[in-house]
Amino acid sequence: MLTLQWPADVIESGSMRRFIPWLIAAACAADVLSARAQAFPPPVGDSARRGYTPADVHFMSGMIYHHTQAIQIAGWAASHDAGPSVRTLCERIVAAQTDEIALLSRWLATRHEAVPQPDPAHMMMPEMNATHIMPGMLSAEQLAQLDRTRGPDFDALFLRLMIQHHQGAITMVNQLFASGAGEEEPVYKMASSVYADQTTEIERMQQMLAADIFAPTTPK
């Protein structure tokens, strides 16, 4: 377990409460990664020669749609008056998942597979193609509800919905490995990275909600 030291003036000022979720998440990160490695040991043998499967293509393509929606709603932080801690989280989500979309797209392109080009605007529409709805993705109604909120209300609802979204990504990884796919090394590494990152961020968001660092208003 990681041990982190905080300056005495931060603790005495009472501002330490704001950092509790991040402190706990950082301390748990090493344990999460260790558990992840035990849950899905790396493939044995020359995985590069095993080739990829249709399930791998479905996972890599689906994750592009999944990440695109996460980037979309995380990008609302500034315009929807999110608090500092939520903005920091959103910035990390946008940066990390933008990089992963580039890797996912490159993997598909080099194998001459179709590379999805999702339009975030279409994700707000109820008639969005059901084949593009991955586990945990927000419905058009949920997106519209989040888009209507501002400030602390946005923060609280964003965290709850992003936890749902991240849990869906973990489900996608579990389904990939349960099907016997994910043997090709790049696919395995991507799936493992998604699992570890999203698990850590779920822990972080749950702690942020539990710490009650914002006070949602009650509609009149």
List each language-model region with its residue ranges.
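Short, Lys/Arg-enriched N-terminal segments with co-localized hydrophobic residues
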Residues: 3-15
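Short linear motifs centered on Gly/Pro in flexible linkers and helix caps
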Residues: 5-8, 27, 52
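Generic low-complexity segments that are intrinsically disordered, proline-rich and/or Lys/Arg-biased
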Residues: 5-8, 22, 117
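Bacterial N-terminal signal peptides that target proteins for export
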Residues: 13-23
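N-terminal twin-arginine translocation
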Residues: 17, 32-36
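Bacterial N-terminal signal peptides
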Residues: 22-31
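All-alpha RGS (Regulator of G-protein Signaling) helical domain and cognate RGS-like helical scaffolds
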Residues: 37-220
